[in-house]
């Protein structure tokens, strides 16, 4: 309510991001997304709502365990079943879902996003990818991702049929003003890609 009272009249206030990030059907998340999304829509006259869950795959970083692989990767059939159930329960309250792409292996990303897109069409929810611009394959947490890995993820998302892409996190990992030297090169490669380079 406070955010709406302060900023709701600004033209830049175009919708809501529900910040609860989950990867699976857990913690009464259907009720949380349903109630929060419904509240935000009613408060703002129907402005769109979005969530950005992660794919709980082999690359998922668990700060409470040693190593990157948390040892609890979701299978594709379980992902499909759980997200169908979640989407069925939040239809009309959540308009778009941007799946964080860093949790699963590159070879599995297209399959997970394809399943998500199919479920999204079934339930009337727009599916996007949330491209993580940092590298999970390095012993240091976290450095800007190599361009060829980002391109691989963008192409997998395109093949899966996502509606669009968002990114986490531009200012640290891809900005030409970032303190990470690697971010400057990543930004140049991405600009070249947008201009039609690298044979989209």
For each of these PLM feature ranges, what is it?
Residues 1-200:
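Glycan-processing catalytic domains of CAZymes
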């Amino acid at each position: 309510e406070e955010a709406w009272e302060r900023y709701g009249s600004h033209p830049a206030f175009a919708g809501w991001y529900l910040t609860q990030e989950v990867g699976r059907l857990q913690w009464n998340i259907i009720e949380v997304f349903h109630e929060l999304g419904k509240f935000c829509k009613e408060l703002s006259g129907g402005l769109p709502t979005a969530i950005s869950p992660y794919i709980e795959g082999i690359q998922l970083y668990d700060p409470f365990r040693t190593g990157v692989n948390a040892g609890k990767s979701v299978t594709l059939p379980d992902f499909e079943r759980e997200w169908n159930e979640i989407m069925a329960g939040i239809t009309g309250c959540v308009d778009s879902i941007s799946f964080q792409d860093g949790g699963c292996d590159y070879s599995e990303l297209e399959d997970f996003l394809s399943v998500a897109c199919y479920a999204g069409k079934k339930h009337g929810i727009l599916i996007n990818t949330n491209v993580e611009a940092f590298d999970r394959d390095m012993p240091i947490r976290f450095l800007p991702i190599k361009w060829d890995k980002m391109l691989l993820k963008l192409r997998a998302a395109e093949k899966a049929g996502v509606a669009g892409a968002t990114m986490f996190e531009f200012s640290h990992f891809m900005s030409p003003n970032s303190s990470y030297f690697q971010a400057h090169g990543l930004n140049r490669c991405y600009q070249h890609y947008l201009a039609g380079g690298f044979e989209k």
